[in-house]
Amino acid sequence: MSNAAVPFVSGIRNLVSVYDAFIVDLWGVIYEEQHLCYGVFNALSQLYDEGKPVIFLSNSPLRSSDVAKNLERMGVKPRLYKGVLTAGEIIYHELKAGIDPFFSNLGRKCFHLGPECFWQPYAQLGYVCVPNIDEADFIFVTGTFGTQDSLDKYEPFFKVCLSRRLPMICACPDPFILQNGALHIAAGALAAQYQKIGGNVFWRGKPDPSVYEYCLEGLDVSDRRRVAGIGE
């Protein structure tokens, strides 16, 4: 392990000569709770002026186009970045393609765990949301039942799912979310717990190296060492 001190970087201006492209997290870097973080517009404008492409990478269960619309509503214009990639976008295309062996016997009926709005982008793929876990072929997780949840609350639910050997798809790997200044468990924590007790879970998103490969392909850089990741 290296004992070298981590250098302090005071601003984007000190990075533009070192890196050719940037993969940037959204929550906590670009915005928090639908408000842009301080200095974001100036930083993105500087990268744009210097010809440094930016791809935003998020574990949101929403599709990339929906996140791009949210960014524009907050004042981040599409010209300032090259693209957006979300965990939800990757899951959407995995479900649509059905190439991964995980999907070979998935079935068409899912029990959705999370806010209803997060399921809407996937409804067009022909899967049916069922209200009862006994009818489901698999579990689709985008969130929790509520912000005051704890993992203990889900133990009976997990036991039923495991007894039926239901596979789980997690479209938001983040274990926690920050709301009103407090941390709450999120979809990723539920998926990790289900996997821990023996459940079969499929997920994509940070910090899985494959999602960075998608971003690098989109950036089309000749030297990957000159791509900076900002955020978690």
Task: Give each language-model segment a name.
Residues 1-232:
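HAD-like aspartate-dependent phosphatase fold
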